[in-house]
Amino acid sequence: MSTATPAQNKSNDSIRYAIEAKYHFGIVVPHHTSMAYLINDYARGGEINIIRQRYKKDLWESYLNRPETGIGMWFSTFGRPDIYGEGIAIYPYINFRIFEWQKLSARYRVALGLGYASNPFDYEKNTYNTVFGSKLNAYVGFGVLLRYPIGNYFSLTSSFSLNHMSNGSSRKPNNGINTATLTFGAVYELNQFQEPTYHNTSPPPSKAREILATISAG
């Protein structure tokens, strides 16, 4: 399958940088019965992301349709501040292109990082919190994003996001928490940038020999 990679000239050796800020509003998904009774508010928060998009030739991004990569910070309430507290996460992420139609573009995001829960389970002070057994947690985020430029430096952005935090049962209790949110925000371009011209090409063929065998029964 062919993918778009930059034409081989000096103008393509460039990197785009931008900063993105978004507001989150949504729900905490009550995947345990106790959570359904305790949650009494929406999930609210935000995120800030540093965006990098590389156009240098012979990079892995060239064969994946030039995805955006970067580092971000996410913050959210969890529907019951006195029990579940709030969460903060720092993560690297990658945004893959889905389609582009005129000025509108769509991407999907995968993020994985470290999360912090402000009010975990405590035998004396917070026995209702069966979601977080520790302050340190893993963070996983997925999203589908839309973006529309309004000038040379600004773009409007919106997305549907799924966010998860848990400690992987390294410390009990650990039901983990999931939020489903809609986001609205803006992107500001940090450098004046024009996307290079691309030719269709394919990744170089692998010289390694590959053997695949499967066995099934029943």
Predicted regions mapped to residue ranges:
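Residues that define the transmembrane beta-barrel architecture of outer-membrane proteins
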Residues: 15, 40-46, 65, 84-90, ...
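Extracellular loop and loop/strand-boundary signature of outer-membrane beta-barrel proteins
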Residues: 33-36, 78-81, 126-132, 167-174
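Gram-negative (and chloroplast) outer-membrane scaffold detector with strong preference
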Residues: 66-116
